Amino acid sequence: MIDSRRTDHAVVLGGSMAGLLAARVLADVFARVTVVERDRYPQAPQSRRGVPQAAHLHVLLMRGLDILKDLFPGIDGDLIGHGAVPIDTGADLKWLTPGGWGPQFHSGLRKLAFSRELLDWLVQRHLAARSNVHWRDGWEARSLLSAGGCVTGVRIHDGEHGEDLDADLVVDATGRRSRLTDWMRDAGFVAPAETVVTAFLGYSSRTYERPPGEERGWKAVFIQAAPPLSNRAGVLFPIEGNRWCCTLGGGNKEYPPQDEAEFLAFARSLRAPVLHEVISRARPLSPVATYRATENRWRLYHELAAPPEGLVAFGDSVCAFNPVYGQGITVAALGAVVLGQVLRSGAGGLPRRFYRELAAVVRSPWMLATSEDCRYPLAEGGRLTRGVRVMQKYVDRVVAVSCRDLTVRRLWLEVFHMLKPPSALFRPHILGRVVLGGA
């Protein structure tokens, strides 16, 4: 158990975005924070083996960006200084929804577009400036250390040598492929149950040259899938270095290809030609990268009667979402806020309190992601209850009305970016506009 008078050392397993966020809030409480990361950190923005999805488009929702700005002051300026592209989500995004083209209007809701490599590199640099954060890159965790029913540290290895790290708190942020539940069982602890929902979705991505100064009337385009009639989607966003990042997705096992010619053919098959028209004339800068680990997986730590003291699972290690909805980094950022609040409120029963608070944060994005995935006929794991069907129909109506009603559209964007809760869509003045078809 953490002694509030002796918060000496926290160890974070996994040094990708979730781990960096956890380390940031731990650094406010612990005298020393050690980040254990299997990969070596690069000296410049580049992909790492431990972030296999880095080649694909990453959308940082506006709520997530707000939290990053609070935790890492100046991060937005650094992103822009390295070429990130400001985007007004109303005016600059050309979005084909299942209900039609969304209106383009100046919303004042600004996000930034950039590569995952740039974001990870800048956040790690910000965190490395803190004198009480230490790095063990090139090492990975192998097992937990425990005594008296509590986790007391972790066994790490660099491929040649092993070492025991004692810790007052171990935070597992090793991602959706976390082995923490196995380590818990090996140490004699009860591991959580899990629930998995999959739409058998995969995606393929490629970067292209983006000539500066071109005027198109938009900066980014999103051709959304509309299952079950259309299971394919595509998104094209500008990123630093005068590049486009194009990601194509397909659910219901309609996986986009890795072959260059087939990649273009898949883009041509989308519900609108605009994305294909751009990339078919652009110069490719990378090979086609593919990714299929897209299931929604929630390990139900909050249901454990007595989770072990001295140990917290975090980020995708707890709940991993279908990446197509862009929720992962933002939910991890919200989790960091929760972890910081729980740490400041006292040491007793920290894991149990954290998991319960985190579950309240996870519940809405989980519901939105899984209810959308359940639209695909081959989806597994989700329950199409009457409540889910009612919600799907209401969301369909909201999206359709938002294509002609700017009040509903703006609110939908705010909910999508987690600036407002989904319950805002049911407020009387919005409910009336949705039911009556907009103003």
Model-inferred region functions:
Residues R5-V36:
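N-terminal Rossmann-like FAD-binding beta1-loop-alpha1 element of flavoenzymes
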Residues A113, N242, E254-V338, V342-P365:
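FAD/FMN-dependent oxidoreductases across multiple families
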Residues A129-R271:
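Predominantly flavin-linked oxidoreductase catalytic cores and closely associated redox partners
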